[in-house]
Amino acid sequence: MIISSASDYREAARRRVPPFMFHYADGGSYAEQTLARNVSDLENIALRQRVLKDMSELDTSIELFGEKLSMPTILAPVGACGMYARRGEVQAAQAADNKGVPFTLSTVSICPIEEVAPAIKRPMWFQLYVLKDRGFMKNALERAKAAGCSTLVFTVDMPTPGARYRDMHSGMSGPYKEIRRVLQGFTHPFWAYDVGIKGKPHTLGNVSTYMGRQIGLDDYIGWLTENFDPSISWKDLEWIREFWEGPMVIKGILDPEDAKDAVRFGADGIVVSNHGGRQLDGVLSSARALPPIADAVKGDIKIIADSGIRNGLDIVRMLALGADATMLGRAFVYALGAEGRQGVENMLDIFKKEMHVAMTLTSNRTIADIKPEALVDLSKL
């Protein structure tokens, strides 16, 4: 099929990847209301077109935590990326590296830290959950430091997993999931050969290394559910702040008071995020939550936003709402599932071109120029 926009990659991935993996990325929790609002709330924000400005010199690059980024985005941590393309985390990291943006490796990646880090030139970011097994957390931090990871992304919005009903229907979980996955493999032969056979082992690399035994996809949900810690508080993170010397970003902030707590805690950044609508359904979209958070802490801490970003225009919208940078999750997973590394590189090129158009026609030469004035206040019309 012809790929002309990032949204085309979703359809391409739907065709190539078996349903249990496609819907794992595509779906949200409960009735998926927040998942839908993440996208629609961004789509409904009108950009303010300005013309007859000299836009011949336009720059999409930023500096974040001492790193130069070619555009204000980071590939977000996504679990089990190695099930979308052969050794998928390596391919996605190489694509990000080639395009000048960071890649964030998930705690529950297929490829372990030690496989991904040597495959790229720039330091990757590493994401960690708060888990009951503090020994695993310390081990993961030590390995991330040894591999040269530059920034720690600490996900705090999963003290308990959300109810993802779509996974029950697709075969990711639910009755007869093993046989359903096998049957889906027969109907997706290219994926079955490229990923299912040549992409082995299909284990959670970071977890398996620590446990000394293979933790596979069938154990994935169970291991996470068993190890999520609903008792966590800011105090539990203090030892991590002392242990981790590099930049630390708290992911999963939706309330201004929590953002202020992150500043008091000493975090270097936050990610305004509802986990892509995969945790608590019915919460605010990130686009709605972002402006009051920016009002509360802008300038005191770096603000990254994710959830619902589907094109380069959405990146500009998030920046105008108060973000310093953005994270892309589903968008890159669709591209990875469709075309591997080349797909992710092409997707990033598309996003950058779309940003160029949006910045040119809103008369913003640099990322720092993008302010709330780049948006139309529809309440006054």
From Swiss-Prot:
Top EC category: oxidoreductase
Domain FMN hydroxy acid dehydrogenase: 1-380
EC number: 1.1.-.-
Location of this chain's protein in the cell: Cell inner membrane
Active site: H275 (proton acceptor)
Function: Catalyzes the conversion of L-lactate to pyruvate. Is coupled to the respiratory chain.
Name this protein carries in UniProt: L-lactate dehydrogenase
Gene giving rise to this polypeptide: lldD
